[in-house]
Every structure is written in structure tokens, then in C-alpha cells.
Design a protein with these regions (language model features):
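N-terminal glycine-rich phosphate-binding loop for ADP-containing cofactors
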Residues: 1-550
Length: 550
């Protein structure tokens, strides 16, 4: 065995992708050679003109591999890995169960058994759904391969050094290999942003995804300070500051006065209209929305939001940058909340309503994780920042009504200084040094003045939260926020961790059916109020389905 049972099984079960340097480090491959001499080196290995192929390096590794071949230990190891996988996948992926079964059985004709298993899984519904999502993902990346209007991008500036600004700077340097300048009036914030980038790059080195020699090359691409440096040298300026229209307009003015006439200004706003932000610009055709999601290095979806007078060259250059950063672009209509947050926020709020109704934080998050989400809704609120979410609600409520009304007692959380991961205080407790989520902060119930009763079944919690999301997704189609449902499916998977094996938000909507959704929403209206009122698009589609079935 090259890497042993444990490592090999974990790679198979997670579907982990492995770069060549990581593969060399793990022992999956023997050598990395230049393309020009690849054939010759391969021949040397075949004919024995080189040292023996990679073997176990030390006595400890030999002992580990020998131990893994002991029957009782092998069985114990597989059971432990099975428990780990179940905690993450919750039996939602048939392939994981099939792989574990094959490893347990250890048949004599193992290759034949694996081939039969693969053939069955390939025809499975989950496999077809996953392949469709991946195919659409690739299409979204490649449909913009010929961006003739984009021009060359040589340097990027980021305004704001918070988690968002730091994340944008990191992917610009690490993935796009572009120089990036972080500007912020707070020097400490800039230092934290630079440190975050260094830690993320260091992690890439540890995982074998980045050669150590390139770490310093990447980190030297990032600079920061209180002022712009490099007269007229930024091709794109990305603002990642808090939601204040006047502030964003002032930043446009400052950037326009400093940089060239063709410099693009990209706003990372959550709720403000891009047209409003651009209304006082000298060159509104250069203003566009480019909306990332926290944590930027993990959430690969980026919304591209042009307003009515945004030029095609600006759109092309924004899309080009996003693709170079390794992200997936989604063109959306200029409307508060855009697409991802528009469907995400009602789902998050409903989870909070469940807390107010006496459900435990851990129970709610676990129920949605068993449904297939990579992270529970309340943990996601902590990631987003409770203060940011609450500040966005009044604007969204004015535009879309009571579905976005601030729930009761949210002020209690703000007064208790609970902003989530960024200040280590939220629905969860966080490690003081690493910032990793540890456990539910049970004092949250006292702050909200509630008693945990856990009256709801997990299925009821899931139904309440998912119905709000499905209804809002239908509103987005009704209002032409997006026009392609397949792209909406990929966006929901990449942007908010909607279960990939369910095919995305619109695939799941079609699976349940508009008739069922409308009926359940009307029942929820009776139980919980008007926020569950089904949208016209759903009602019309339900009527059409009923008529077709008659």
C-alpha cells in the first residue's frame, strides 16, 4: 500500500482533490518531472534504470501499514472512519456507503466488485444530480472564456481590511497572482488582514497545495496601509466597507480622483442599490457590484451586479477578475440582497424564530446539517456577522415586506455584543486563539429570555426553514433576479452550501412540486403568520400542475 488504509479511505470518501505536490508528499506518485523528459523517465522506471519506486520511508510508517492489515484493527479503523463520515454526510451520499462496504468485505475479486458497484452508482439519481451541478458549474466558468472587452488586469486595490476585505485580498494574490493593496484608516486592521493572508497561505503549504518557496512570492503581492500607493496603477478598486451609502459614494469620489479614467470601482454591498451607489460618480459606467461571501476563500460564488449604465467593458473586466480569483461568476439583477442573500436570509431568520419558540441552537443546526447543509443556519449567522445581518433587515423589509422584518429580541443580542465569529461571541463559543467554533454558548438562552423546550421534531424544523427559502427563490424568478434556474442551483450550492446531492434550490423545488409547497406554506400561514404567504409564481405554477394532472 502506498499511503495506507486510513489515508486512502478518507481520500476516497471525501472525494478530496490532490495536486501533484500534495500527491508526491502523500506518496501517491514517485516523482515530478518536466514534461519534456516525462516519457524518458517513465521508460527508465519501466526498464529498471532508476532506483526502486517509492517505498515506505521509516519504521514507523512500516509499523502503521502492518497494523492496518491486522483483521481486528482494520475492522476497528473502518468503523471509526464510518462514524466520522456519518457525522458529516449523514448517509446522504450512496457512494460513501458503497465504498465502506467494499472495504469491509475485501472480496477476492475486488476489481470486479468495484466495477459492478461503480456501474450501479453511475446510474443512481444522486450521481446524475451531482454530475448536472458540476456540468453547470463548468459552463458558468467557461462561458466567459473569450472576454475581448476585458483588457489586462495588472493590479487590484481593496478598500477595507475586515474579514471580507482580507479574504478578497488573499484570493487575489494567492489564486490570481495579482498585486493587491489593502487600504484602511485603521492600521491594526491592515496588519490583521496581512496576518490572515499569511496564515491561509501557510495552511496551503501544510496541505501540500502550495510549494513553500512560493509562499513568500504570494505574500509579497499583498501590501496595505492608510493611503493609496502607486499613482494611477489599480485596474479595479473593490470596496468592502460597512453598509453606508454616503461612505461608499465618498470612496468612489476618492478613487476617481486618484486613479485613471478607466479604473473600475466594484462595490461589495449587501443591500444597497448599485445604481444608487453610482448615482454621484463622475464615471458611472465604471461602477459595478461584485458581491463576495464570507469566508471568501471557501465560498466560491460571486455575484456580478451591473446597473443600467454599466459598460460592457466593466462587466467583462469584473468577470475576468473573478474567474482569475478561482471563483464562479453569477450575473444578477440590481436589487437589494441580490440572489444568494435574498434566499438565504429568510431561511436564517426562520432558524432564529425556532430558537425563540424554544428549540435548542444545536438541535436546529444539526437538523439542517442532516438535511445536507455543510453548516447549520445559526452557525452561518455567526459566520456572516449578526450585526451585519440585522443592519441589512430594515432596507430589505422596506423593499420586500414582512418576510425580512427584524425578529423580536435581536436587540438583546446586539446589546450583549454578540457579533459572531469576528468577536468570538454569538450563538457559539469560539477558541480564543484560532477562532474555531467549539460549542453552543448556552448563555444565549438567558440573553433571549427563553427556556429550551424542544417541542419540534427535526423534520418540522427543516420544513419551516426550507419552505421560507423555496418561497423566496420563487420570488427571485418572479422578479427576474436571475433567469437561469440551473445557474441558480449552482449558486445555491457554492454560495450558501445548499445540499449538492439535492441538485440545488430549484431542483429541490421541482422535486417537491409547487402544489405541495403552496399547500404547506398555507398551513404555515395559519400557524406562524403572513411571512409564509406563497408568492404568485408558486401559486400560478401549482394551478398549472393541478390542471395538467386533471
Amino acid at each position: 500500500a502506498r499511503i495506507g488504509l486510513k489515508q486512502g479511505l478518507l481520500m476516497l470518501l471525501s472525494g478530496q482533490k490532490c495536486g501533484v505536490r500534495s500527491a508526491l508528499k502523500k506518496g501517491l506518485i514517485d516523482e515530478i518531472v518536466p514534461k519534456a523528459i516525462l516519457f524518458q523517465v517513465a521508460c527508465d522506471y519501466i526498464y529498471g534504470n532508476t532506483p526502486a519506486l517509492r517505498n515506505v520511508k521509516n519504521r514507523y510508517q512500516k509499523w502503521v501499514l502492518k497494523r492496518e492489515n491486522i483483521t481486528w484493527f482494520r475492522r476497528y479503523l473502518i468503523e471509526q472512519i464510518e462514524q466520522q463520515v456519518w457525522l458529516k454526510a449523514f448517509d446522504n451520499y450512496p457512494a460513501t456507503k458503497a465504498i465502506l462496504t467494499l472495504f469491509k468485505q475485501r472480496q477476492e475479486n475486488q476489481p470486479s466488485a468495484e466495477s459492478e458497484c461503480f456501474a450501479k452508482l453511475f446510474q443512481d439519481k444522486t450521481s446524475k444530480v451531482l454530475r448536472k451541478v458540476e456540468r453547470t458549474n463548468r459552463e458558468m466558468r467557461h462561458q466567459y472564456h473569450d472576454l475581448q472587452d476585458a483588457g489586462e488586469i495588472k493590479k487590484v486595490a481593496v478598500l477595507g481590511s475586515g474579514f471580507m476585505g482580507a479574504g478578497i485580498a488573499y484570493i487575489t494574490a494567492a489564486r490570481a497572482s495579482l498585486p493587491v493593496r489593502i487600504k484602511d484608516i485603521n492600521p491594526d486592521g491592515v496588519q490583521k488582514a496581512l496576518r490572515l493572508s499569511y496564515l491561509l497561505l501557510q495552511k496551503e503549504v501544510e496541505l501540500g497545495h502550495l510549494p513553500y518557496g512560493k509562499l513568500l512570492q504570494k505574500i509579497y503581492l499583498i501590501s496595505g496601509g492608510e493611503r493609496f500607493i502607486g499613482k494611477q496603477r489599480a485596474d479595479i478598486v473593490i470596496e468592502a466597507v460597512y453598509e453606508d451609502l454616503q461612505l461608499k459614494q465618498n470612496l468612489i469620489e476618492e478613487s476617481e480622483n486618484y486613479y485613471d479614467n478607466d479604473t473600475i470601482f466594484a462595490s461589495n454591498t449587501l443591500t444597497l442599490s448599485i445604481a444608487e451607489i453610482a448615482s454621484k460618480a463622475q464615471r458611472p459606467q465604471n461602477v459595478i457590484g461584485v458581491h463576495y461571501f464570507t469566508p471568501v476563500n471557501q465560498r466560491r460564488m460571486v455575484e456580478i451586479v451591473p446597473h443600467q449604465t454599466t459598460s460592457q467593458a466593466t462587466i467583462a473586466k469584473a468577470i475576468k477578475l473573478v474567474i482569475e480569483q478561482g471563483q464562479v461568476p453569477l450575473l444578477v439583477k440590481d436589487s437589494p440582497g441580490f440572489f444568494i442573500n435574498r434566499i438565504l436570509i429568510p431561511y436564517l431568520l426562520e432558524a432564529y424564530y425556532c430558537v425563540l419558540d424554544g428549540e435548542a441552537v444545536g438541535t436546529i443546526d444539526r437538523a439542517l446539517q442532516e438535511f445536507g447543509f455543510g453548516i447549520g443556519p445559526l452557525a452561518m449567522i455567526d459566520e456572516m456577522g449578526l450585526d451585519i445581518l440585522i443592519k441589512a433587515l430594515p432596507k430589505l423589509e422596506r423593499c420586500f415586506g414582512g418576510r425580512f422584518a427584524p425578529p423580536k429580541k435581536v436587540d438583546n443580542l446586539l446589546l450583549n455584543d454578540r457579533k459572531g465569529r469576528k468577536n468570538r461571541r454569538g450563538f457559539y463559543l469560539y477558541h480564543s486563539r484560532t477562532g474555531d467554533r467549539t460549542q453552543v454558548d448556552k448563555s444565549i438562552y438567558q440573553v433571549l429570555e427563553i427556556t429550551v423546550e424542544n417541542n419540534l421534531e427535526p423534520e418540522q424544523i427543516v420544513r419551516r426553514c426550507i419552505l421560507m427559502m423555496l418561497n423566496e427563490a420563487a420570488y427571485c424568478l418572479q422578479e427576474n433576479i436571475i433567469t437561469n434556474q440551473n445557474e441558480g442551483n449552482v449558486a445555491s450550492v457554492l454560495g450558501m452550501f445548499f445540499p449538492e446531492f439535492r441538485g440545488g434550490i430549484y431542483a429541490y423545488l421541482d422535486e417537491i412540486g409547487a402544489q405541495t409547497i403552496v399547500a404547506e406554506l398555507m398551513l404555515m400561514v395559519e400557524q406562524h403568520g403572513e411571512r409564509f404567504q406563497p408568492c404568485e409564481w408558486l401559486v400560478t405554477r401549482a394551478a398549472q400542475q393541478a390542471e395538467a394532472a386533471a
